[in-house]
Structure formats: C-alpha cells, structure tokens
C-alpha cells in the first residue's frame, strides 16, 4: 500500500448554510503521477485537474465542483481585470461580463455620477492608444542627451533592439518553415485540410517529407500554431517600432497628462479597445477566470459566476502608473471584490500613486491578485525589482495583495515554470501558468504561458471563496490561498540557477493554489479580524 501524505487532517465543517465534506487532496504521490504524454483534452484542462484523482497536478477545480460544491450557488462576485482590453463579445464570456446597472448605455451622460460616462462594462483608460514605449525609454527621454543616465538607458535600449531583431528573424524563419512543411504535407496527402493523426501514420519516403513531419511534430509538441506564431511576430515588430523606439509617442492620442494624477477626465467606455486583436491578452485572462463551466469543446473557467469588470489600462508596451492607480480605484469604488493584475514592469516613476491605490483597496476589503513576472528572476528585496509590488523597502505595506508565480503540468523537479519569477518573500504562492488553454478574440482559442495565466487561475479560486464565504476579509482569503495550497514537488529547479531547491525558497508558502483544499480550509477556520 502506497503511503499518502495529507496536507492537513480530514475535515467535515459547515459555514452558514454551506457544508463542504471531504479529505484535502494529497501530495507527493509520485507513484501515481501520470507518466505518459497528456491527451489533447488533458492538455486543455490540466490546470483544473487533481493530483489524487487524475494524476495531474492542477488546482482540483473539477473535483471541487463535483464532490464539494455539487450545484450549490454562492454569490456572484465582481472580478476586475486590469489588462489590455477584452473581447466582451466572445461566446465564452457571454453572461460573465459585469454590467453597471446604474448607467444608461450610450446616452453620453454620467448617470451614476462616478466620473465616467457610459461605463457599462468598465472603463478604457487608454482611449484609442495601442502601442507604447517601455518605461525605461520614457525615462530616458527625460534625461539630457550625453549624460550618464541617458547613456545607460541608451545602452540598454540598443541591446534590447538587437535582441528583438534576432527574435524577429528567428520567428520569420519558423513561419517560413511552417509554410514549406505545410505545402509538402498537403501535396503528399492530396488535401488542403489534415489532422495531426493523419500526419503521424506516415512513413516518409523522401528526406523533405521526413523534415516536414519532424517540424510539424516540433510545432505540435510546443503548441505553436500559425496564429500564435503571427502574434509573436507582431510582438517582436512592435518592440522594435514602438517599445524601444525613442521617437515614438503612443500617449499623444489619449490627450491627458500621464504625470498628473488629478487629470482623470480621459479615456472612453470602449473596453474592447480600438482593435479586437489588441485584446488578446485580456481576453485570454478573462477566459481563464470565468468561461462557462458547461463546456468541453471550447474552454472552462474556474468560476463562471464571476462578473468581469473590464479595465483597459495596459497597452502594448509598459503601462503608466497613473492608469493603474486610477483603474484600481475605479474597481474598488464600483464593487469589485477581486482585482486581477497580470502585468508588470521594471521601473515605476510614480509608484506612490499605485501604493496609495493598494492601500485604498485594502481599506475597502478588496483582494488584488498579481502576476509575479516572467524573467525567471528572484524578486525578493535586494534582487530584481518589479512593479506593481506591495514591497516597500523590504516591508509589506498591505495585507490584501497576493503575488503569484507559475507552474506547469509536470509533477517533478521541473514543476516550476522556467520563466517564472520567484522569491521566498515577495512571491506568495504558485498557480498553473504554463500552456493554459483559453479564449482569444474573434471566437478563437489558444494556449499561452506566463504568470499572466497563473494570476487569473488564482483569481478564479479567490472568487469562488469570496462567493461561498462572503464574510471572509481579503487578507483572510489570501491566507486561505497560501495555507491550503498543495505543496510543490519536494525539490524543484530554481528558474534562475537550475539548481534543485526546496519550494519554500521560491515562494513564501512553497505551495500552489488548490480550490478543493481552499473550500475545506475556509470552512475550518475561526479567523482573527
């Protein structure tokens, strides 16, 4: 008999009229972990699976709904998503978008007198702006050419442009190979449309066909679709043409002063943004949180009783501190109970505005779930600085801020994603963030990786807890996410050094978010106020 190590003792405890009965999910179940490659279905929904039941180290979401929630309806929870804009017309998000009932659509009147005209689903703080500089380039513009500060920024800027040009060339080569391989396979099969299964049964009779098949398998193994390659190509081009272009000014079209926090009469109510394709990131994030649960063909969200408040404040480039601070305040003032912030940058000239907004959210009991970042770096005090953060001179200034790193679907030494930032002080917990399937604009779906995907997974779990335990405070929800999480594999690779380390050296909890455990844990606790 295999020894099962439980996270905490079995609990049968009720909270109000809700009763959750079950054993917390297990960990270190190495003999039962799935060893074969995940099926196509499992790849799409691995983050919702359970280590004990499915041999896949997800967040035990499906198990929680089946064994604990069992059709019970909690309260709807407003989840604000501060991001790049969202395709609110995507079928997956139908019924999941927040509606401001106090505002009359399209009458050009601020009916609820909250300072925002026709804000039916949120607010677009960027107006028609799309591309933007990196913050380092904006700071460089303020320095005197030839000064030490200017030259330091210039050295970094030119280095980044060089790297992006190399990246652009590599992606162009892959896309060219894609088309060549596709043409060879189509000619061999004698058909325009084919499946990977049809490709796999081939025994190549020519070297060119063998190369084409190998390349197709490479693309499939890395979940690289044509549409994803085109997105990566556009991102590289945008980095060269806008992000690191010192002559580019993306803010001019907005019409405000981005360095005056009191200049807040700007933006518009178009939360999609000027182009749907620009809402790729935000749509993917929202799908992770709130796509319909009754769906095996498209996507399944963590909590489809979420009401998504869309706040477009993150351009293609670095966000402005003013936009983020005002977006947080908007979310708080208009009823959000969870705010997802899947973005970050290395410089924050007006960070105090954002810190004041974090404190504002804390006073009003709003939980903020933040992506740790994708540099594979230590973000603890004394190491790499990233913003937004609740770390001020090594001190945590608020209790309602959760920073989330990313893990993948492997329950072994490689569980922590190689790109994920980490830190035993400034990263609180991990969540699934590697190759997450979700919706993207124009009724499509895609796999994406990043702590940007980990944060909404954690936000979804937080929203479920807020739904069924509405009396719990934001700091208590944070404690629940951290304490009830499933411990990571006993030793994992440090993303920066590659050394095997204890998970406790990579985050404060050493755990990944787990809904099944969190429901039981929340039932069990007599929290201190």
Language-model segments: residues:
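Bacterial N-terminal signal peptides
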Residues: 6-14
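Bacterial Sec signal peptide processing site at the extreme N-terminus
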Residues: 15-31
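C-terminal subdomain of the subtilisin-like protease fold in secreted/lumenal serine endopeptidases
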Residues: 17, 23, 332-334, 338-341, ...
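Short acidic, glycine-rich surface-loop motifs adjacent to enzyme active sites
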Residues: 35-44, 154-176, 328-351, 371
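Mature extracellular/periplasmic domains of secretome proteins
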Residues: 65-73, 276-279, 300-303, 318-340, ...
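Subtilisin-like serine protease catalytic core
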Residues: 66-78, 86-320, 396-400, 422-426, ...
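Active-site glycine-centered loops adjacent to acidic/histidine catalytic or metal-binding residues
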Residues: 83, 373, 450
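Extracellular S/T/G-rich loop segment that most often corresponds to the catalytic His/Ser-adjacent loop
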Residues: 251, 366, 389-467, 471, ...
């Amino acid at each position: 008999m295999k020894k099962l190590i439980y996270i905490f003792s079995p609990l049968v405890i009720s909270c109000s009229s809700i009763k959750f009965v079950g054993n917390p999910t297990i960990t270190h179940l190495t003999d039962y972990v799935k060893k074969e490659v995940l099926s196509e279905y499992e790849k799409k929904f691995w983050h919702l699976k359970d280590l004990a039941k499915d041999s896949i180290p997800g967040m035990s979401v499906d198990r929680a709904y089946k064994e604990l929630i069992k059709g019970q309806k909690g309260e709807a929870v407003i989840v604000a998503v501060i991001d790049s804009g969202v395709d609110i017309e995507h079928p997956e998000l139908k019924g999941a978008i927040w509606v401001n009932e106090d505002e009359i659509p399209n009458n050009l009147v601020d009916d609820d007198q909250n300072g925002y005209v026709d804000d039916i689903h949120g607010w677009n703080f960027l107006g028609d702006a799309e591309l933007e500089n990196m913050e380092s380039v904006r700071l460089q513009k303020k320095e005197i050419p030839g000064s030490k500060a200017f030259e330091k920024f210039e050295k970094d800027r030119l280095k980044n442009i060089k790297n992006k040009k190399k990246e652009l060339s590599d992606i162009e080569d892959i896309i060219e190979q894609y088309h060549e391989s596709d043409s060879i396979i189509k000619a061999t099969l004698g058909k325009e449309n084919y499946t990977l299964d049809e490709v796999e049964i081939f025994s190549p009779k020519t070297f060119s066909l063998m190369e084409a098949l190998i390349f197709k398998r490479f693309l499939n193994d890395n979940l690289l679709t044509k549409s994803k390659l085109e997105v990566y190509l556009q991102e590289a081009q945008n980095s060269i043409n806008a992000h690191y272009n010192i002559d580019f000014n993306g803010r001019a079209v907005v019409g405000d002063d981005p360095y005056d926090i009191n200049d807040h009469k700007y933006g518009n109510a178009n939360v999609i943004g000027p182009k749907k394709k620009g809402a790729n990131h935000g749509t993917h994030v929202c799908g992770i949180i709130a796509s319909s649960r009754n769906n095996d063909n498209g996507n399944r969200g963590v909590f489809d009783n979420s009401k998504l408040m869309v706040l477009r404040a993150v351009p293609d480039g670095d966000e402005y501190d003013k936009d983020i601070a005002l977006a947080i305040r908007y979310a708080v003032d208009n009823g959000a109970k969870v705010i997802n912030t899947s973005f970050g940058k290395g410089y924050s000239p007006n960070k105090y505005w954002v810190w004041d907004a974090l404190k504002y959210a804390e006073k009003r009991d709003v939980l903020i779930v933040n992506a740790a970042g994708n540099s594979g770096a230590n973000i603890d005090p004394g190491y790499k600085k990233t913003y937004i953060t609740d770390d001020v001179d090594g001190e945590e200034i608020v209790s309602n801020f959760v920073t989330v790193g990313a893990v993948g679907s492997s329950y072994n030494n490689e569980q922590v994603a190689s790109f994920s930032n980490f830190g035993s002080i400034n990263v609180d917990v991990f969540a699934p963030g590697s190759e997450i399937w979700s919706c993207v604009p124009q009724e499509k779906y895609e796999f994406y990786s990043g702590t940007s995907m980990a944060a909404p997974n954690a936000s979804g779990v937080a929203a479920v807890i807020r739904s069924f335990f509405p009396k719990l405070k934001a700091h208590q929800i944070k404690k629940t996410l951290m304490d009830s999480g499933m411990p990571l594999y006993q030793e994992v690779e440090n993303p920066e050094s590659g050394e095997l380390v204890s998970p406790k050296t990579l985050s404060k909890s050493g755990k990944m978010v787990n809904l099944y455990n969190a429901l039981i844990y929340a039932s069990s606790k007599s929290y201190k106020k």
